[in-house]
Amino acid sequence: MSDSLTELLLEIGKALIVLVGIVGAGAFMSFIERRLLALWQDRHGPNRVGPFGLFQLLADMIKMFFKEDWIPPFADRRIFILAPIIAFTAFILAFAVVPITPTWGVADLNVGLLYILAIAGLAVYAVLFAGWSSNNKYSLLGSLRASAQTLSYEVFLGLSLMGIVIQTGSFNLRDIVEAQAGLWNVVPQFLGFITFLFAGVAVTHRHPFDQPEAEQELADGYHIEYAGMKWGLFFVGEYIGIVLISSLIVTLFFGGWHGPWLPPFFWFALKTACFMVFFILLRASLPRPRFDQVMSFGWKVCLPLTLINMLITAAVVLMNVQ
């Protein structure tokens, strides 16, 4: 077997392992969320299927798989089917450039940050397609909310990272992690971290920024007409987005795989898991603001913070050069 073929097979195997790990982490997070919410709300949570309810996730998957794959007769069939596929794959493709360890990652791109912002932006199309193709007023209103919120906060998401790019001089995520060997970016880039955290919650439509779904207002928003595995793709895609944002926070601000004693993979996984639990804690503890308050917070608070962070970082770098 030639070296090139061996290398190709290794890369394919590596990509498959990362794919299974991401989907598994996103699916398992849904179970952990239900257990933690039950703990914090003083109730039992899922505890009937398997020991400690561990097989509840498998039961839910079987249920979704065997539910009727119904498409409304008034829907645009092709776009209706395409929407959940885009929602599921966009965040997975974005994960391709995230370095898990010094030697483990699917791709090492010099423009890794730009790639993530571009690919993650495809999720907006999934929301718009779902809302428009469903031909339902609540679905359309939810998709319009989601697209406005996502497009707005993706601006802040990108601007919050420009301070890191100015500081490290690279869009490569591996270079950014290596630059944090002595000091994590969360210290000099604290404003960038805060705005990235807010924007990450908003882009993934998580509580308290879950305005596109707002059950009390929009009857579950843009995926109201979806059922079975199509709804399951939206559901798992949301949790994969949380895994992606958590891993990016760790990679960009908390040193990635760097840490004492433990192997690099365990440090990366432990830090990522901590932020995934933090996302769940936000859902359990915060109320949902109005949609106009969410948009005002982005443009009146997050945008100025990102610009201030860029100016401070540029000034510090310029002073160090001189």
From Swiss-Prot:
Annotated TM spans: 12-32, 79-99, 111-131, 151-171, 183-203, 234-254, 262-282, 301-321
Enzymatic class: translocase
Subcellular location: Cell inner membrane
GO annotation, cellular component aspect: plasma membrane; respiratory chain complex I
Alphabetically ordered keywords of this record: Cell inner membrane, Cell membrane, Membrane, NAD, Quinone, Translocase, Transmembrane, Transmembrane helix, Ubiquinone
Topology term for the membrane: Multi-pass membrane protein
MF (Gene Ontology): oxidoreductase activity, acting on NAD(P)H, quinone or similar compound as acceptor; quinone binding
Catalytic reactions of this protein: a quinone + NADH + 5 H(+)(in) = a quinol + NAD(+) + 4 H(+)(out)
Pfam family of the protein (one): NADHdh
Keyword Translocase: yes
Stored InterPro entries: NADH_UbQ_OxRdtase_su1/FPO, NADH_UbQ_OxRdtase_su1_CS
Entry EC number(s): 7.1.1.-
Biological processes, Gene Ontology terms: aerobic respiration
Family, as annotated: Belongs to the complex I subunit 1 family.
Protein's job: NDH-1 shuttles electrons from NADH, via FMN and iron-sulfur (Fe-S) centers, to quinones in the respiratory chain. The immediate electron acceptor for the enzyme in this species is believed to be ubiquinone. Couples the redox reaction to proton translocation (for every two electrons transferred, four hydrogen ions are translocated across the cytoplasmic membrane), and thus conserves the redox energy in a proton gradient. This subunit may bind ubiquinone.
Subunit structure: NDH-1 is composed of 13 different subunits. Subunits NuoA, H, J, K, L, M, N constitute the membrane sector of the complex.
HAMAP family linked: NDH1_NuoH
Name this polypeptide is given: NADH-quinone oxidoreductase subunit H
The organism of origin for this protein: Shewanella oneidensis (strain ATCC 700550 / JCM 31522 / CIP 106686 / LMG 19005 / NCIMB 14063 / MR-1)
